[in-house]
Swiss-Prot record:
Top EC group: hydrolase
GO molecular function, one term: cellulase activity
EC number: 3.2.1.4
Protein species of origin: Ruminiclostridium cellulolyticum (strain ATCC 35319 / DSM 5812 / JCM 6584 / H10)
Signal sequence annotation: 1-29
Protein name, per record: Endoglucanase F
Function: Probable endoglucanase involved in the degradation of cellulose or related beta-glucans.
């Protein structure tokens, strides 16, 4: 059959139906206005996410990382949460406000964040934080590549620069406490550390990653943020990570994930815009977001405030600022003694950048921070971030990893021949190598979505050029299958490096930097982020391929992956053998206990210090699969992915109010062609209704039922054109 049947044959299909139904004259007739279709999908997802029976939220109103408890990726348990999830909660509620006119849910998301994810004065006593010395922000401790090299010795002889923004912040807000989200929270107190070492209260501030780029989640040792030496070993968990010359003091410590705080600002901007359109106000939440953005500037600075591009020297102020959203900033201090510290991060990943948030915090009068340099610092960051993307854009269009001001985490000399960005060396996979931090496709869509929003709002020429090339690359990598499903890149790999950045010259094309798609998959969260990105880009640029692909991804997910709790797909977890066989490094001679009595000692496995997993409802199924030599499978409902899909539908509804789902009668499998395969699939469906089909296209007589009449009409239509 001719491939032209996609267009010509479809007309014949419609004509052949004239005996029993009214002729269809358009093969792409919209079924209903898109604002209604995609808005309804958003509202359906919102209802499922907020339904208490589905289990997305704790009794305190905190979103879990996932509904499922047996779950290891960046978090090591499904019922922890992250600042990432909290920022998506804000975004979800902002969109709900846009459609419902009710922004109380959005304000509540900020209240929950402030109560549970931003350490209060009880969690970071101002008596300790006020003793912070901006001229001596922290004591240097080298980083190592492998966990077996830890604990790391504190070294007071190494240069540490001056913190130039602390006085700005204390002057603006009248406190020495920091205002940012800690990145991970044990929502149900599963580990048993409790709040401030009480062992029982929930939620509980915890941490995991501490020991270099090769420390995967599977190799971490969970620890409390408030360490009174009550759990763990003689000195709690502190001497697993740093080696002090004296007795480790009882202390608190928190780590911020800058991309999440920036996403919170991003979501709050849209809530503010949409509220104003309806005569409403979210000004209290705007004030919180603006304050958070002010403190987020700590991520602009080298870890120990050393000079950018000259890291052997202590910085004297802003010469220690790279103006990028680095991997973290962190702070801590004494529990029963008055001292404190603050560090930035030397490592910068393109995936954490958010030029949209930088634009908001530097240009919107309502979002300009209170501090003296807040808005101007964010203005510099906006330009520096866009330069960073330009420097890292591969020949194909995908964005490569990042740069560090501290080679190997020890301020070693950047190897000869290494490309640099303002003196910082190119790193293919910044911060983490197991797995490589820029091998996950999700970084592409998370980060470029923010560039797309910036382009949509401002028309920035730099953002447009980045997106033009990136969109061309990714649109060529999306695969729509005959059965209505799809595949997008899952793992990507890199070859070569970018050209050394010259601000005057700008983007060179990076002929020696290449991306390769290693494998494809159906990550619904990433696909939703991709649809969101392409929607914003298409709305501003008019690129029809991007609009169509965004719509097709949204439709494919809705039609093929919806379930009673949201969307999901069966995932193969080839890494789950590490539950049983992954050793967690503990120095010889070090012993301690987890709150439940699990012994921490040399030779322990992941499961040995997380024995409560053996009580999980999915545990026996997973172990049985492993023992049978099979790869365990799961259906997972990650909060961020569910929210991303909901928001992406909302974005499409807003930006394309007149574009509904395309309808091609007879295209039962959704491959945009009507042929004998569709007839066969429809027959299979009639025999077994679990078969996946495009019901709108299969309903040949538009009676809202798929039955033998539709089969007969499709068969008649196909025969008439042969």
């Amino acid at each position: 059959m001719s491939k032209n049947f996609k267009r010509v044959g479809a007309v014949a299909v419609a004509a052949a139906m004239s005996l029993s139904i009214m002729a269809t004259t358009s093969i792409n007739a919209a079924s209903s206005p898109a604002n209604k279709v995609y808005q309804d999908r958003f509202e359906s997802m919102y209802s499922k996410i907020k339904d208490p029976a589905n289990g997305y939220f704790s009794e305190q109103g905190i979103p879990y990382h996932s509904i499922e408890t047996l779950m290891v990726e960046a978090p090591d348990y499904g019922h922890v949460t992250t600042s990432e999830a909290m920022s998506y909660y804000m975004w979800l509620e902002a969109m709900h406000g846009r459609f419902s006119g009710d922004f109380t849910g959005f304000d509540k998301s900020w209240s929950v964040t402030e109560q549970y994810l931003i350490p209060t004065e009880k969690d970071q006593p101002n008596t300790s934080m006020s003793r912070y010395d901006a001229n001596k922000p922290a004591t240097y401790a080298p980083e190592f590549q492998d966990p077996s090299k830890y604990p790391s010795p504190l070294d007071t002889s190494q240069p540490v620069g001056r913190d130039p923004i602390n006085s700005q912040l204390t002057s603006a807000y009248g406190t020495s406490m920091l205002y940012g989200m800690h990145w991970i929270l044990d929502v149900d107190n599963w580990y048993g550390f409790g709040a401030r070492a009480d062992g029982t209260s929930k939620p509980s501030y915890i941490n995991t990653f501490q020991r270099g780029e090769q420390e995967s989640t599977w190799e971490t040792i969970p620890q409390p943020c408030w360490d009174e030496h009550k759990f763990g070993g003689q000195y709690g968990f502190l001497d697993l990570f740093t080696k002090d010359t004296g007795t480790p003091a009882k202390q608190f410590k928190y780590t911020n994930a800058p991309d999440a705080d920036a996403r919170a600002v991003q979501a709050t901007y849209w809530a503010d815009q949409w509220a104003k359109e309806q005569g409403k106000s979210v000004s209290t939440s705007v004030g919180k977001a603006t304050k958070m953005g002010d403190y987020l500037r700590y991520s602009f600075f080298d870890k120990y405030f050393r000079k950018i591009g000259q890291p052997s020297q202590a910085g004297t102020g802003y010469d220690a600022a790279h103006y990028l959203l680095s991997w973290y900033y962190a702070w801590g201090g004494g529990i029963d003694s008055t001292w404190s510290w603050i560090i930035g991060s030397s490592h910068n990943h393109f995936g954490y950048q958010n030029p949209f948030a930088a634009w908001v915090l530097s240009t919107d009068a309502n979002f300009k921070p209170k501090s003296s340099n807040g808005a101007s610092d964010w203005a510099k960051s906006l330009d520096r971030q866009l330069e960073f993307y330009q420097w890292l854009q591969s020949a194909e269009g995908a964005i490569a990893g990042g740069a560090t001001n501290s080679w190997n985490g020890r301020y070693e000399a950047v190897p000869s021949g290494t490309s640099t960005f303002y003196g910082m060396g190119y790193v293919e996979n910044p911060v983490y190598a197991d797995p490589g931090s820029n091998t996950w496709f999700g970084m592409q869509v998370w980060s470029m979505q923010r560039v797309a929003e910036l382009y949509y709002k401002t028309g920035d020429a730099r953002a447009k050029k980045l997106l033009d090339k990136w969109a061309k690359w990714i649109n060529g990598e999306i695969k729509f299958n005959a059965d209505g499903t799809f595949q997008i890149p899952s793992t990507i790999d890199w070859e070569g490096q970018p050209d050394t950045w010259n601000p005057t010259q700008g983007y060179t094309g990076n002929a020696n930097l290449h991306v390769k798609v290693v494998n494809y998959g159906t990550d619904l969260g990433c696909a939703s982020s991709l649809a969101n990105t392409l929607t914003y880009y298409a709305a501003k640029s008019g690129d029809e391929t991007s609009r169509q692909n965004a719509q097709k991804l949204l439709d494919a997910m809705w039609n093929n992956y919806s379930d009673s709790k949201g969307i999901s797909t069966v995932e193969q977890r080839g890494d789950y053998h590490r539950f049983l066989d992954q050793e967690v490094f503990v120095p010889a001679g070090w012993t301690g206990k987890m709150p439940n009595g699990d012994v921490i000692k040399s030779g322990v496995k992941f499961i040995d210090i997380r024995s409560k997993y053996k009580q999980d409802p999915e545990w026996q199924t997973m172990v049985a699969a492993l023992q049978a030599g099979q790869v365990p499978t799961q259906r997972l409902h990650r909060f961020w992915a569910q929210s991303e899909f909901a928001v992406a539908n909302g974005v499409y509804a807003i930006l394309f109010p007149d574009q509904g789902p395309e309808k091609l009668l007879g295209d039962v499998n959704g491959d945009e062609t009507v042929d004998a395969i569709d007839l066969a699939i429809l027959k299979k469906y009639l025999l077994n209704s679990s078969t996946t089909i495009n019901t709108a296209n299969a309903d040949m007589n538009s009676d809202n039922a798929i039955d033998a009449i539709d089969y007969a009409l499709l068969k008649k239509a196909l025969l008439s054109i042969q």
